[in-house]
């Protein structure tokens, strides 16, 4: 059984726990899977760039590369789940204020209609030089879309992003 399947079933996760409850670790896994666009089980520099911008952090390529070097302890060229957990709990846990999350939401909500649509994600991906498939975008929306209307409103976005606030 894959770790993702174990987490969905509520079994004890493998790897370092950083003092997190199983529930919080599952929530971080959900965010990790959202940003692991290619499903490789790790986040490369390109995916990290998308993740940081989505979280409201405007970072240039040099800053992304520096963050990768700092977080990628095994120097694999990508951030695995344990490294992501460490980054989220030690580096960015305290950064998820309501103002910062609202700013991130507004950046992604290109048409300013109060919802993040597949079109909004396509537009920000284009700005970032990313090329997501429609399936990738659909999966991103489904991760946060609690009312199942096909878009992510501010409340849904806040709930999803606040689940990564452990600092």
UniProtKB/Swiss-Prot annotation:
Keywords: Calcium, Cytoplasm, DNA damage, DNA repair, Metal-binding, Nucleus, Repeat. InterPro entries: CALM/Myosin/TropC-like, EF-hand-dom_pair, EF_Hand_1_Ca_BS, EF_hand_dom. It is found in: Cytoplasm; Nucleus. One of its GO terms (cellular component) is cytoplasm. Expressed in leaves, roots, and at lower level in stems. Barely detectable in flower buds and flowers. Induction: Up-regulated by UV-C induced DNA damage, but not by DNA double-strand breaks caused by bleomycin. Ca(2+) 3 binds at residues 109, 111, 113, 115, 120. The C-terminal EF-hand is necessary for the binding to RAD4 and for efficient nucleotide excision repair (NER). Interacts with RAD4. Calcium is required for this interaction. Interacts with SAC3B. Potential calcium sensor that binds calcium in vitro. Modulates homologous recombination and nucleotide excision repair (NER). Involved in the early response to UV irradiation. This is Calcium-binding protein CML19. The gene is CML19.
């Amino acid at each position: 059984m894959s770790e993702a399947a174990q987490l969905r079933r509520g079994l004890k996760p493998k790897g370092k726990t950083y003092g997190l409850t199983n529930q919080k670790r599952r929530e971080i896994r959900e965010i990790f899977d959202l940003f692991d666009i290619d499903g490789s089980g790790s986040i490369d520099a390109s995916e990290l760039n998308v993740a940081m911008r989505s979280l409201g952090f405007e970072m240039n390529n040099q800053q992304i590369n520096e963050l990768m070097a700092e977080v990628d302890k095994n120097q694999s060229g990508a951030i695995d789940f344990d490294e992501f957990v460490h980054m989220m709990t030690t580096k960015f846990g305290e950064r998820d204020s309501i103002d910062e999350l609202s700013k991130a939401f507004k950046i992604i909500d290109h048409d300013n209609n109060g919802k993040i649509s597949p079109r909004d994600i396509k537009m920000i991906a284009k700005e970032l030089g990313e090329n997501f498939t429609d399936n990738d975008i659909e999966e991103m929306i489904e991760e946060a879309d609690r009312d199942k209307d096909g878009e992510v409103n501010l409340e849904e976005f806040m709930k999803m992003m606040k689940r990564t606030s452990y600092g």
